[in-house]
Amino acid sequence: MSNQHIEELNDQQIVRREKMAALTEQGIDPFGKRFERTATSGQLNEKYADKSKEDLHDIEETATIAGRLMTKRGKGKVGFAHIQDREGQIQIYVRKDSVGEENYEIFKKADLGDFLGVEGQVMRTDMGELSIKATHITHLSKALRPLPEKFHGLTDIETIYRKRHLDLISNRDSFDRFVTRSKIISEIRRFMDSNGFLEVETPVLHNEAGGASARPFITHHNAQDIDMVLRIATELHLKRLIVGGMERVYEIGRIFRNEGMDATHNPEFTSIEAYQAYADYQDIMDLTEGIIQHVTKTVKGDGPINYQGTEIKINEPFKRVHMVDAVKEITGIDFWKEMTLEEAQALAQEKNVPLEKHFTTVGHIINAFFEEFVEDTLIQPTFVFGHPVEVSPLAKKNDTDPRFTDRFELFVMTKEYANAFTELNDPIDQLSRFEAQASAKELGDDEATGVDYDYVEALEYGMPPTGGLGIGIDRLCMLLTDTTTIRDVLLFPTMK
């Protein structure tokens, strides 16, 4: 520790270090050792919820708990405190004549934030609060910094995101939200495993960005002296496994996209991608609906959910609508009709739809109309299918109308939650679409990808008809925890 650091310590930090030294002089390790507890706060509160003060007095049940000291009050020979563990808090009642002078001094000198082990009898106070009447106290770890202001919790948004450890200590709602996130991911796994899918792991470092339209992070592999990219999707590797005969695979993992940040976007995020041989996009719609309804029922219970004051009927069958029909319903423009690029551009100008340089086909303009007019109207769970082929380089063309693909996106509360399609398994068609993407990249489309010749070669060995799916897990967590920013469901969001 440098002298400069010592000089920067405030009065509280200095006092805490003095107490640390005093513990050492007493032969007590300030940072403790293994401690065996017999119960958590949650277990005790659940087990004795219906027991009165008299009941507990007669039972004479003992318990050993451990956790962080969050409150402390009292004077003389009696004190009260609250110990916090991962399930919540429980009060401890400490009497000098019950724990002994040495033990009582440990309690008396303990600072808020310190970790203590407490053994004692389960009781209920005159006020009705479940408590532990301590018979022995063990010092477990010294906190050298004071906690955030104890009564109001941590409220500074920047600190909440930059110092999540303090947020978790101070804000129980935040702690519970991340427990829910963990349950959501566990339930997704449970659903996929029970439906015969195999969980796999694919590379994070790729030679060529692919599987999505996004700008990648670029890094350098020193040993091979080559530039590589962090994956923007897991798609192309997972489909290689379908070629290899695995038939049903999925991966839950981090994806990296070198793009802007807002309420629903973080440069690194978690997704699930899944691929099922011998299925099409309609089968995958059923799978997607099944995943989301299973997770919602497990985490939130039966019935609709409430998101920011809006009732979402997530327990009912999801609406299904073709993109062209959705655009027609809102704007009155019928893109089913054959039209030239010039006619489509004129319609866009008439409706003030921004036109990008790489919008070189009617399909690009249909997609722009959808994004401009339809997305913000999609509140209830809605599958929008039939995306133009130009914006779906990995999706199979529709048999009836090859201008469109057998692709869908799931929207809830105006946001996209899933993207899926009947996979393109024609290597010749795939190569031409990769080449079209490469051309768009040259015209300035930063999200367009290059040509992955190795993937095309894999397709040439034959891939069965396949349906594929990607779900943004962070957005699903936002929906099911009623939060409005992705930073509230990421333990460590990207910060400037």
UniProtKB/Swiss-Prot annotation:
Q: Which organism is it from?
A: Streptococcus agalactiae serotype Ia (strain ATCC 27591 / A909 / CDC SS700)
Which of this chain's residues are annotated to bind Mg(2+) 2? Answer: E416
Q: Which gene encodes it?
A: lysS
Catalyzed reactions per annotation: tRNA(Lys) + L-lysine + ATP = L-lysyl-tRNA(Lys) + AMP + diphosphate
What the entry lists under NCBIfam families is as follows:
lysS_bact (TIGR00499), PRK00484.1 (NF001756)
Complex and partners: Homodimer.
Task: Return the protein name.
Answer: Lysine--tRNA ligase
Question: Which of UniProt's keywords are assigned here?
Answer: Aminoacyl-tRNA synthetase, ATP-binding, Cytoplasm, Ligase, Magnesium, Metal-binding, Nucleotide-binding, Protein biosynthesis
Identify the domain of life: Bacteria
Subcellular location(s): the record lists: Cytoplasm
Give a Gene Ontology cellular component term annotated to this protein.
Answer: cytosol
Molecular functions (GO terms): ATP binding; catalytic activity, acting on a protein; lysine-tRNA ligase activity; magnesium ion binding; transferase activity; tRNA binding
Q: Which GO terms describe its biological process?
A: lysyl-tRNA aminoacylation
- Provide the E.C. number(s) assigned to this enzyme: 6.1.1.6
Family the UniProt entry places it in: Belongs to the class-II aminoacyl-tRNA synthetase family.
- PANTHER family named in the record: LYSINE--TRNA LIGASE, CHLOROPLASTIC_MITOCHONDRIAL, LYSYL-TRNA SYNTHETASE
Residues that bind Mg(2+) 1 = E409, E416
Q: What does the record's cofactor remark say about binding?
A: Binds 3 Mg(2+) ions per subunit.
Mind telling me which InterPro entries this protein's record contains? Answer: Aa-tRNA-synt_II (IPR004364), aa-tRNA-synth_II (IPR006195), aa-tRNA-synth_II/BPL/LPL (IPR045864), Lys-tRNA-ligase_II (IPR002313), Lys-tRNA-ligase_II_bac/euk (IPR034762), Lys-tRNA-ligase_II_N (IPR044136), Lys-tRNA-synth_II_C (IPR018149), NA-bd_OB-fold (IPR012340)
- Which coenzymes or cofactors are required? Mg(2+)
